[in-house]
Amino acid sequence: MPTIQQLVRSERHKSSKKTKSPALKGCPQRRGVCTRVYTTTPKKPNSALRKVARVRLTSGFEVTAYIPGIGHNIQEHSVVLIRGGRVKDLPGVRYHIVRGILDASGVKDRKKSRSKYGAKQPKT
Protein backbone atom coordinates (compact mmCIF):
# COMPACT_ATOMS: atom_id res chain seq x y z
CA MET A 1 0.00 0.00 0.00
CA PRO A 2 1.65 3.28 -1.07
CA THR A 3 1.75 6.31 1.20
CA ILE A 4 -0.04 9.52 0.22
CA GLN A 5 3.35 11.14 -0.43
CA GLN A 6 4.27 8.35 -2.87
CA LEU A 7 0.95 8.83 -4.69
CA VAL A 8 1.57 12.60 -4.90
CA ARG A 9 5.00 11.95 -6.42
CA SER A 10 3.69 9.55 -9.09
CA GLU A 11 0.03 8.66 -9.52
CA ARG A 12 -1.22 5.15 -10.18
CA HIS A 13 -0.91 4.24 -13.85
CA LYS A 14 -3.95 2.82 -15.62
CA SER A 15 -3.43 -0.61 -17.13
CA SER A 16 -4.43 -0.20 -20.78
CA LYS A 17 -6.53 -3.01 -22.26
CA LYS A 18 -5.07 -4.40 -25.50
CA THR A 19 -7.71 -4.78 -28.22
CA LYS A 20 -8.21 -8.13 -29.96
CA SER A 21 -9.15 -6.46 -33.25
CA PRO A 22 -6.82 -3.48 -33.80
CA ALA A 23 -7.65 -3.05 -37.50
CA LEU A 24 -11.20 -1.91 -36.64
CA LYS A 25 -9.77 1.05 -34.67
CA GLY A 26 -12.63 1.01 -32.16
CA CYS A 27 -15.40 0.77 -34.77
CA PRO A 28 -17.94 -2.08 -34.75
CA GLN A 29 -17.37 -2.86 -38.46
CA ARG A 30 -15.11 -1.71 -41.29
CA ARG A 31 -15.44 -1.77 -45.07
CA GLY A 32 -12.71 -3.27 -47.22
CA VAL A 33 -11.79 -4.65 -50.64
CA CYS A 34 -10.84 -8.31 -51.08
CA THR A 35 -7.34 -8.71 -52.48
CA ARG A 36 -7.27 -12.52 -52.42
CA VAL A 37 -9.86 -15.24 -51.78
CA TYR A 38 -8.56 -18.71 -50.92
CA THR A 39 -8.96 -21.79 -48.72
CA THR A 40 -6.73 -22.81 -45.85
CA THR A 41 -6.45 -25.78 -43.50
CA PRO A 42 -7.12 -25.56 -39.73
CA LYS A 43 -4.86 -26.44 -36.79
CA LYS A 44 -4.00 -29.97 -35.67
CA PRO A 45 -7.02 -31.99 -34.48
CA ASN A 46 -9.36 -30.51 -37.13
CA SER A 47 -9.40 -31.10 -40.87
CA ALA A 48 -11.22 -29.00 -43.49
CA LEU A 49 -10.80 -26.39 -46.23
CA ARG A 50 -11.83 -23.13 -44.56
CA LYS A 51 -12.75 -20.23 -46.85
CA VAL A 52 -10.86 -17.02 -46.05
CA ALA A 53 -10.16 -13.71 -47.77
CA ARG A 54 -7.35 -11.19 -47.55
CA VAL A 55 -9.01 -7.77 -47.18
CA ARG A 56 -7.56 -4.25 -47.47
CA LEU A 57 -9.57 -2.08 -45.04
CA THR A 58 -10.45 1.62 -45.17
CA SER A 59 -8.37 2.00 -41.99
CA GLY A 60 -5.28 1.07 -44.04
CA PHE A 61 -4.80 -2.41 -42.57
CA GLU A 62 -4.65 -5.61 -44.61
CA VAL A 63 -6.24 -8.47 -42.64
CA THR A 64 -7.33 -12.07 -43.13
CA ALA A 65 -11.08 -12.55 -42.65
CA TYR A 66 -13.17 -15.72 -42.44
CA ILE A 67 -16.10 -16.24 -44.84
CA PRO A 68 -18.86 -17.96 -42.79
CA GLY A 69 -21.64 -20.17 -44.14
CA ILE A 70 -21.95 -22.69 -46.96
CA GLY A 71 -21.06 -21.28 -50.38
CA HIS A 72 -20.17 -17.66 -51.20
CA ASN A 73 -19.95 -15.26 -54.13
CA ILE A 74 -16.95 -13.27 -52.88
CA GLN A 75 -14.09 -12.80 -55.33
CA GLU A 76 -11.14 -10.48 -55.80
CA HIS A 77 -12.15 -6.75 -55.74
CA SER A 78 -15.42 -7.54 -53.89
CA VAL A 79 -16.32 -4.82 -51.37
CA VAL A 80 -17.14 -6.45 -48.01
CA LEU A 81 -17.93 -5.49 -44.42
CA ILE A 82 -15.65 -6.86 -41.68
CA ARG A 83 -16.52 -7.45 -38.03
CA GLY A 84 -14.35 -8.69 -35.18
CA GLY A 85 -14.32 -12.28 -33.98
CA ARG A 86 -11.60 -14.85 -34.39
CA VAL A 87 -11.71 -18.39 -35.76
CA LYS A 88 -10.20 -20.64 -33.10
CA ASP A 89 -8.61 -23.22 -35.39
CA LEU A 90 -7.21 -20.76 -37.98
CA PRO A 91 -4.12 -18.92 -36.67
CA GLY A 92 -4.03 -15.25 -37.66
CA VAL A 93 -7.73 -15.03 -38.63
CA ARG A 94 -9.23 -12.47 -36.22
CA TYR A 95 -12.07 -11.07 -38.33
CA HIS A 96 -15.32 -12.27 -39.95
CA ILE A 97 -16.95 -11.09 -43.16
CA VAL A 98 -20.57 -9.97 -42.60
CA ARG A 99 -22.87 -11.87 -44.99
CA GLY A 100 -25.79 -10.14 -46.73
CA ILE A 101 -24.13 -6.68 -46.85
CA LEU A 102 -22.39 -4.94 -49.80
CA ASP A 103 -21.00 -7.54 -52.26
CA ALA A 104 -21.28 -10.54 -49.88
CA SER A 105 -24.62 -12.25 -50.51
CA GLY A 106 -26.53 -14.11 -47.80
CA VAL A 107 -26.39 -17.89 -47.43
CA LYS A 108 -28.88 -19.62 -49.72
CA ASP A 109 -31.58 -21.94 -48.26
CA ARG A 110 -30.67 -21.05 -44.67
CA LYS A 111 -33.57 -21.76 -42.28
CA LYS A 112 -32.06 -21.34 -38.81
CA SER A 113 -29.84 -18.53 -37.45
CA ARG A 114 -30.70 -16.54 -40.58
CA SER A 115 -29.72 -13.14 -39.18
CA LYS A 116 -26.13 -14.31 -38.66
CA TYR A 117 -25.81 -15.28 -42.32
CA GLY A 118 -27.81 -12.52 -44.02
CA ALA A 119 -30.52 -14.89 -45.27
CA LYS A 120 -33.99 -13.60 -46.09
CA GLN A 121 -37.14 -15.16 -44.59
CA PRO A 122 -38.22 -18.14 -46.72
CA LYS A 123 -41.53 -17.91 -48.57
CA THR A 124 -44.17 -20.13 -46.95
UniProtKB/Swiss-Prot annotation:
InterPro entries: NA-bd_OB-fold (IPR012340), Ribosomal_uS12 (IPR006032), Ribosomal_uS12_bac (IPR005679). Its main location: plastid. One of its GO terms (molecular function) is rRNA binding. With S4 and S5 plays an important role in translational accuracy. Located at the interface of the 30S and 50S subunits. Keywords: Chloroplast, Plastid, Ribonucleoprotein, Ribosomal protein, RNA-binding, rRNA-binding. Pfam families: Ribosom_S12_S23 (PF00164). It comes from Gracilaria tenuistipitata var. liui. This is Small ribosomal subunit protein uS12c. PANTHER family: 30S RIBOSOMAL PROTEIN S12 FAMILY MEMBER. Part of the 30S ribosomal subunit. It comes from the Eukaryota. Residues 1-28, 104-124 are annotated as: Disordered. GO terms for biological process: translation. It is found in: Plastid, Chloroplast. GO terms for cellular component: chloroplast; small ribosomal subunit. Belongs to the universal ribosomal protein uS12 family. Residues 11-20, 109-124 have a biased composition (Basic residues).
